[in-house]
Amino acid sequence: MNSPEIAPNFTHPDRNLAMELVRATEAAAIRAVPFIGRGDKNAADKAAVDAMRVFLGTVNFDGVIVIGEGEKDKAPMLFNGEHVGNGTGPACDIAVDPIDGTSLTAEGRQNALSVIAVSSRGTMLDASSVFYMDKIVTGAAGFGVVHLDQPIGDNLRALSQATGKPIGEMVVAVLNRPRHEGLIDAIRSAGAGTRLMSDGDVAGGINAARYGTRIDMCVGIGGSPEGITTACALKALGGFMQGRLAPKDDAERARAIAAGLDVDKVLDLDDMVSGDNTFVVATGVTDGGLVDGVRRKGPIIRTESIVMRGKSGTVRRVVADHLAAKWL
């Protein structure tokens, strides 16, 4: 039986990279566990950052962090522009979020993840000068049907017609923020239900694009780093996404323009990450709709991760048992 025509492009170093990245997110998630429900989000974040940094330093790639923990003078590790990896292997852009949902972790709530997104060097949008992004995410049915500039009611009706799913059965994920009060009212007035997220909009965006979930759409203003990470994931999921940078004030707008960003442009997937040579890995810190959180089972620590590869359009789940004595 002949191999698929695209198979020769799947190089072994690229395939192996996925498992190396999983080890980094697993380590970050495990190290955050002692801080779940303890009320100290900064301590949880530091533990995850420290663990991820160590593991990334051993990976066979030449990585540059495009989206990290902060500017070089504000974050000692995993800062924007930092080089990670051992310098061999593919040259990559990297987005890291050692904990997407530090508040969720500190409060012991669901949907906290440790996330890494990787793409070929020079393909990932550097949106670090603007903290927020307005976005809309759906499954593949959204292409040519919904648009960021359309009213939410029009988008819901269009997606309902495209999918054959009644609006009354549709669910829209939105961050539960005061800025979204009008948006939430409009969604409900159109007849759809809402899934209000306190944090962690990477999981919300991914679930909106995945087949067979309860989420049909994810909308609203969230973090621009989370937006770029979600875009990388959608390269594997085949979903639809648009975004627009949302500067919080005139100073941030000026900073974005100085960085060469068009803050008024509606960004398509290829504007956020070009090409399909992407990986996204996410390990659960706390339980959620995407993956289970870290669990202690006697002498074993169990982690669950999801691995999404854009080039092959493949989504895998990795369940790993770690000997607790090696970690605690």
Q: At which residue positions do the language-model features occur?
A:
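N-terminal subdomain of lithium-sensitive/metallo-dependent phosphomonoesterases centered on the IMPase/IPPase/PAP
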Residues: 2-95, 157, 161, 202-203, ...
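A short glycine/serine-rich beta->alpha loop
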Residues: 15-18, 39, 103, 142-144, ...
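Glycine-rich phosphate-binding "P-loop"
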Residues: 16, 136-154, 169
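Short basic, glycine-rich beta-strand/loop surfaces that mediate nucleic-acid
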Residues: 84-85, 114-117, 214-218
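DPxDG-like acidic metal-binding loop motif
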Residues: 89-100, 104-125
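A short, polar/proline- and glycine-enriched secondary-structure boundary/capping micro-motif
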Residues: 115-116, 138, 326-328
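Flexible glycine-/small-residue-enriched beta->alpha junction loops
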Residues: 119-147
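An extended, acidic
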Residues: 150-309, 318-319
